[in-house]
């Protein structure tokens, strides 16, 4: 079982991270940097509202809470689109901070009474939710125009020459896809249940595609040749006027959290849509991996005939193994984490950039919704809002405590404000 002290520590780390992202004046927190994102003050109060809902109101939105019902509903993400939230009568930042602090104090009292045999899933859900919103707030801050509010990030390890453009073989055969509550008690519903699948051999990129490799695609006219693009992708490329990854400037620089800088050739490319990733792969004579292929390359140990908890083994993520936590503000150069390689030799599979896969979001066989029933189910393929592609592996902005090889993210194929990149795959 997960110790109460561990849950308390993870709650504290998430809150510390959140508060660092809202250390700005009230006017700044109420700004909407882009219609795709919420004002930061909405995210802040929403974090507290969801914590209260799941830990103090038993997940029942009709159960009275600390906020008046009409205020509580302002923070329902399904009721109010991101574009509309700037026009809502939101709590002032001081009230939002006070609300979050009060909820947290009561939540910790509840944690103290948690039975010893309770794995604390509701607390883990709240921790994951807050950390995911911290990444969302970083996306918003990256879209902000004007003088920088954040620094350029902590130093990162150097990369290794010769790894870009290389691949590793993943032999075919059965493996265990997904996890169960016994092995990963804090896994989310779409990661479960564990089940055996058998897939053919394939090759997968040792590291993600780099900025330098993407520059070759641009220089070769990749954005101007419809033969590399799917019909939907080409239509979007034309409609949106895509000519390079988001935040790349015509003079060869990029804008990152308001800082103008040269584009490092050895960093994984980020801020590309699924359609761009798909086109690049076609141009490179490759394809995108399926999410099942991706998970096997990341987590399966063919010698042990079992899953690894992380690509490198059982050790918890650290600065020597992966770029996580958000303090770097960017991906690490490829080859920076040889100790973090998977059993097959694939590197940087956790952290740095979310990697587009070719897979739509589907439930695993035997899927059962968790207590937060709307977490996954409304987004599955075939639902009214089910136009999504799965991304795997996390990014530099993801908290290390919530990331697993089985973690499944998803977004619309046109989105690229997210910290998204590409890893290639090939048939064998």
Swiss-Prot record:
UniProt cross-references to InterPro entries, sorted A to Z: CTDL_fold (IPR016187), DinB-like (IPR024775), DinB/YfiT-like (IPR034660), EgtB (IPR017806), EgtB_Actinobacteria (IPR032890), Sulfatase_Mod_Factor_Kinase (IPR051043), SUMF_dom (IPR005532), SUMF_sf (IPR042095)
Q: Matching Pfam families, A to Z?
A: DinB_2, FGE-sulfatase
User: Which UniProt keywords are given for this protein, alphabetically ordered?
Assistant: Iron, Metal-binding, Monooxygenase, Oxidoreductase
Q: Where does Fe cation bind?
A: 46, 129, 133
Origin: domain of life: Bacteria
Name what cofactor the protein needs.
Fe(2+)
- Chaperone among the record's keywords? no
The residues the record assigns to binding gamma-L-glutamyl-L-cysteine are 82-85, 411, 415
Question: What is this enzyme's catalytic activity, as reactions?
Answer: gamma-L-glutamyl-L-cysteine + hercynine + O2 = gamma-L-glutamyl-hercynylcysteine S-oxide + H2O
| EC numbers for this chain | 1.14.99.50
Q: Which BP terms in the Gene Ontology apply to this protein?
A: ergothioneine biosynthesis from histidine via gamma-glutamyl-hercynylcysteine sulfoxide
Q: Does the keyword Metal-binding apply?
A: yes
| Pathway in which the depicted protein is active | Amino-acid biosynthesis; ergothioneine biosynthesis
An annotated Gene Ontology molecular function: ferrous iron binding
Q: What this chain does, per the record?
A: Catalyzes the oxidative sulfurization of hercynine (N-alpha,N-alpha,N-alpha-trimethyl-L-histidine) into hercynyl-gamma-L-glutamyl-L-cysteine sulfoxide, a step in the biosynthesis pathway of ergothioneine. Cannot use the alternative thiols cysteine, N-acetylcysteine, or glutathione instead of gamma-glutamylcysteine as substrates, and histidine is a poor sulfur acceptor substrate compared to hercynine.
What family is reported?
Belongs to the EgtB family.
Quaternary context: Monomer.
What this protein is called in its record is: Hercynine oxygenase
Gene designation per UniProt: egtB
């Amino acid at each position: 079982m997960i110790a109460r002290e561990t849950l308390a520590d993870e709650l504290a780390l998430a809150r510390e991270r959140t508060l660092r992202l809202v250390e700005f004046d009230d006017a700044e927190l109420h700004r909407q940097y882009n219609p795709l994102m919420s004002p930061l003050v909405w995210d802040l109060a929403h974090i507290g509202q969801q914590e209260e809902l799941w830990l103090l109101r038993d997940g029942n939105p009709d159960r009275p809470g600390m906020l008046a019902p009409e205020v509580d509903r302002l923070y329902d993400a399904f009721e109010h689109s991101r574009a509309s939230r700037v026009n809502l009568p939101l709590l002032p930042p001081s009230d939002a901070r006070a609300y979050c602090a009060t909820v947290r104090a009561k939540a910790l009292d509840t944690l103290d009474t948690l039975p010893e045999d309770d794995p604390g899933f509701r607390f883990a859900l709240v921790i994951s939710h807050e950390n995911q919103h911290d990444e969302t707030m970083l996306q918003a801050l990256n879209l902000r125009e004007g003088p920088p509010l954040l620094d350029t990030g902590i130093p990162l390890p150097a990369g290794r020459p010769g790894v870009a453009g290389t691949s590793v073989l993943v032999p075919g055969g059965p493996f265990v896809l997904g996890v169960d509550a016994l092995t990963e008690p804090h896994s989310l519903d779409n990661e479960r249940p564990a089940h055996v699948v058998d897939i053919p051999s394939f090759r997968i990129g040792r590291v993600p595609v780099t900025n330098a490799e993407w520059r070759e695609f641009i220089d070769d006219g990749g954005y101007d040749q419809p033969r590399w693009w799917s019909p939907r992708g080409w239509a979007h490329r034309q409609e949106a006027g895509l000519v390079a990854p988001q935040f790349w400037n015509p003079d060869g620089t990029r804008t990152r959290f308001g800082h103008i800088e040269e584009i490092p050739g050895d960093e994984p490319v980020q801020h590309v849509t699924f359609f761009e990733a798909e086109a690049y792969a076609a141009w490179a004579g490759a394809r995108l991996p399926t999410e099942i292929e991706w998970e096997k390359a990341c987590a399966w140990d063919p010698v042990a005939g079992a899953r690894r908890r992380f690509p490198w083994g059982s050790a918890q993520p650290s600065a020597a193994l992966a770029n996580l936590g958000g303090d770097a503000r960017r991906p690490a150069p490829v080859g920076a984490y040889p100790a973090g390689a998977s059993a097959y030799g694939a590197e940087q599979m956790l952290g740095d950039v979310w990697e587009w896969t070719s897979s739509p979001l589907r439930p695993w066989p035997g899927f059962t919704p968790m207590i937060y029933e709307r977490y996954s189910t409304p987004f599955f393929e075939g639902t009214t809002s089910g136009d999504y592609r799965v991304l795997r592996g996390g990014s530099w902005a993801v908290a290390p405590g919530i990331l697993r090889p089985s973690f499944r993210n998803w977004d619309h194929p046109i989105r690229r404000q997210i910290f998204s990149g590409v890893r290639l795959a090939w048939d064998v």
